[in-house]
A protein has these predicted regions:
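Phosphate/dinucleotide-binding and metal-coordinating scaffold of catalytic cores
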Residues: 1-230
């Protein structure tokens, strides 16, 4: 892959275009139709104006922060880098723009990127205990036998703790040094917050044979009504 330009979408609507500059920063310009009645996806950095926005520094890997937020954090980046190496691609040579193409439509948040770069075959959620064991093996620098499944389900996720994502849910697994009760504890914290009147997403504790259960939170970044959740 040698991607130098990506289109940014919100649902099926074109927001604008990203393009790599000669000094490896990533510029952005709003689409004409978006300028007519759209909103600023980053009000302070990217106001609604007909211009090319170029980051002033290499902060956020040369991306504007709103797009850098689409990139996976520690766990997701580990999965992406393993998949790249498995395909003979040095991770350090993959640009931030190409990493956004890998995210495609599978990342957290409402923004998606086209054309997407598919690294994997479709996978299904399957047995959560087996997936958790695969995550632990990867964290311990061991070989994960089903890296494709882990990448498909978690390669675009944020945060440091191992997790997988479905269309509607984010499911967290215990990290290698965490207590097996961490899922139940997080569920109880969220229930407590809800009892205090704090608005929280729907949560569940999914059953496990190995621990007290896996914490799951319903995603709000894919709801049609949440048109401005970036």
């Amino acid at each position: 892959m040698n991607e130098r330009k990506l289109d940014v979408y919100l649902g099926e609507r074109l927001v604008g275009t990203l393009a790599e500059t000669v000094d490896h920063r990533v510029a952005f310009a709003y689409a004409d139709a978006w300028l007519e009645d759209g909103f600023a996806i980053s009000p302070f950095s990217l106001p609604i104006e007909q211009k090319v926005f170029v980051p002033g520094s290499q902060a956020f890997q040369g991306l504007w922060g709103v797009f850098a937020d689409s990139l996976p954090d520690a766990w997701g980046r580990l999965l992406v880098d393993r998949m790249l190496k498995q395909r003979g691609l040095p991770p350090e040579e993959v640009t931030p723009l190409e990493r956004l193409a890998i995210v495609g439509s599978s990342g957290m948040g409402a923004l998606t990127y086209r054309p997407a770069w598919d690294l994997h075959e479709p996978s299904h959620l399957g047995d959560l205990d087996a997936l958790s064991a695969q995550c632990q093996a990867l964290l311990l620098q061991e070989d994960a036998s089903d890296l494709d499944a882990l990448f498909q389900l978690g390669g675009s996720s944020g945060g440091a703790r191992p997790k997988v994502m479905t269309e509607e849910w984010v499911i967290k697994f215990p990290a290698s040094r965490e207590m097996p009760e961490v899922g139940r504890m997080e569920k109880e914290y969220m229930d407590c917050a809800a009892s205090c009147g704090i608005e929280v997403p729907e949560t569940r504790l999914l059953p496990s044979r190995l621990c007290s259960g896996y914490f799951a939170a319903r995603r709000f970044d894919r709801e049609q009504a949440a048109s401005q959740v970036i």
